[in-house]
Amino acid sequence: MTRNDLLDRLATTQASALETQGLGLVPMVVEQSGRGERAYDIYSRLLKERVVFLVGEVNDQTANLVVAQLLFLESENPDKDISLYINSPGGSVSAGLAIYDTMQFVKPDVQTLCMGMAASMGAFLLAAGAKGKRSALPNSRIMIHQPLGGARGQASDIEIQAREILYLRERLNSILSEVTGQPVEKIARDTDRDNFMSGDQAVDYGLIDKVIARRS
């Protein structure tokens, strides 16, 4: 199917959500109101229900979007929980820490749920949700490891970068220790290499609180 064919199908509302995503488009939801019809993209409609998505790489762009949505939802209702749905392979440590700090900063509890994969900073943010409100779907995979980095240039510059990544490793391990209840030494050992877990294993480790198969 060509792009023009797909655009023709969109015009007749016959294209699937998957096909629209292939074009970089987002499905729309039409609601009836006293003033007539109003159309929302699906993510804006779910934002009204206090659902925020972190999907794909954690970078400055995705972090800015998540931070803005958390702050907006706090201003809308500071006493109602926010749900953060995560399907991410991880990414930038600084961008992830910006999201983490905002999750702790806002007044509402931030519930976290892993769907698909939460790896690296994705797993870190999953574990950073409100205690008792961190969950995963049954076939989710969760992976923790130490921060990755590289440096080039003069020896003194490489030394500076090495000190920084070692600091970040210690800081991330300290936070993971706080949110999981595991000793820092164990966190350091377990994150030395990629450490994959099932949902049930993540519960035992303290990264999440429960595995959810169906809505209650």
UniProtKB/Swiss-Prot annotation:
Principal subcellular localization: cytoplasm
UniProt function note: Cleaves peptides in various proteins in a process that requires ATP hydrolysis. Has a chymotrypsin-like activity. Plays a major role in the degradation of misfolded proteins.
Coiled-coil segments: none
The protein's Enzyme Commission number: 3.4.21.92
GO function term, MF aspect, one: ATPase binding
A Pfam family hit: CLP_protease
Compartment(s) of residence: Cytoplasm
GO CC, one annotated term: endopeptidase Clp complex
Subunit structure: Fourteen ClpP subunits assemble into 2 heptameric rings which stack back to back to give a disk-like structure with a central cavity, resembling the structure of eukaryotic proteasomes.
Protein name in UniProt: ATP-dependent Clp protease proteolytic subunit
Record: active site: 120 (nucleophile), 145
Family: Belongs to the peptidase S14 family.
Alphabetical UniProt keywords: Cytoplasm, Hydrolase, Protease, Serine protease
One GO process term, biological-process aspect: protein quality control for misfolded or incompletely synthesized proteins
PANTHER family: ATP-DEPENDENT CLP PROTEASE PROTEOLYTIC SUBUNIT
Keyword Plastid tagged: no
PROSITE patterns, alphabetized: CLP_PROTEASE_HIS (PS00382), CLP_PROTEASE_SER (PS00381)
Catalytic activity, as annotated: Hydrolysis of proteins to small peptides in the presence of ATP and magnesium. alpha-casein is the usual test substrate. In the absence of ATP, only oligopeptides shorter than five residues are hydrolyzed (such as succinyl-Leu-Tyr-|-NHMec, and Leu-Tyr-Leu-|-Tyr-Trp, in which cleavage of the -Tyr-|-Leu- and -Tyr-|-Trp bonds also occurs)
